[in-house]
């Protein structure tokens, strides 16, 4: 059970507990009011008896003494009821306060989880963007080869047996996109990198240089291969 589910279950339980405590508080309040009413009536009767002249009697009146003691006991009972009401109210307050603190902790945990998820998503997006930028400008030096996914135009050309050197692309081209190969066109389809560090073109379409698959080992474009052979012949 997750924290949210557990907290929701505790809230349902809290509602029932508070309902019982509030019902008991109402009962105690009614009892307290009735006890105070009866005690007030008793006190008023005693005061009325005193006014009628019984207070001037030097002989102790045991009935009045007993009456006063009963009134005092009733007043003490009212105090006990009031104390019980305060205890119940404090218990209800503590229960609500405990759940509020739990909710605060849950909100803090949720905020922390959301913050970490946002940071992870931002880091992933940055890595993807860096990877795309690296693929666009990555050189093929040191024998590294790169294969690009074919565009719709290059796929159609391959199915008809046409090479990129004699294929007329009608697709819109971004004027800011870099061009490659001896055909001086943008990157599409599978491409191979020349292993000559000084190669001016660097990347070539398979079809333009007569390749059908990635060459094994080092590979040099026609121009660099010619220069390399001429240097060996000297």
UniProtKB/Swiss-Prot annotation:
GO CC terms in record: nucleus
Compositional bias ranges of the Low complexity kind: 149-165
Alphabetical list of Gene3D superfamilies matching this protein: 6.10.140.1740, Zinc/RING finger domain, C3HC4 (zinc finger)
Cysteines engaged in disulfide bonds, as pairs: none
UniProt keyword rRNA-binding present: no
Gene Ontology molecular functions: methylated histone binding; zinc ion binding
Residue ranges covered by zinc fingers (PHD-type): 178-227
Chief place where the protein resides: nucleus
Binding site for Zn(2+) 1: 181, 183, 205, 208
One GO biological process term: chromatin organization
Stretches the record annotates as Disordered: 129-166
Keyword Transcription: yes
Coiled coil region boundaries: none
Binding-site positions, Zn(2+) 2: 194, 199, 221, 224
Expression sites (tissue/organ): Ubiquitously expressed.
Pfam families per record: ING, PHD-1st_NSD
InterPro entries: ING_fam, ING_N_histone-binding, Zinc_finger_PHD-type_CS, Znf_FYVE_PHD, Znf_PHD, Znf_PHD-finger, Znf_RING/FYVE/PHD
Site (Histone H3K4me3 binding): 180, 191, 195, 203
Cellular location(s): Nucleus
Key words of the record: Chromatin regulator, Growth regulation, Metal-binding, Nucleus, Transcription, Transcription regulation, Zinc, Zinc-finger
Family: Belongs to the ING family.
Comment block on domains: The PHD-type zinc finger mediates the binding to H3K4me3.
Subunit structure: Interacts with H3K4me3 and to a lesser extent with H3K4me2.
Entry function: Histone-binding component that specifically recognizes H3 tails trimethylated on 'Lys-4' (H3K4me3), which mark transcription start sites of virtually all active genes.
Name of the protein this chain belongs to: PHD finger protein ING1
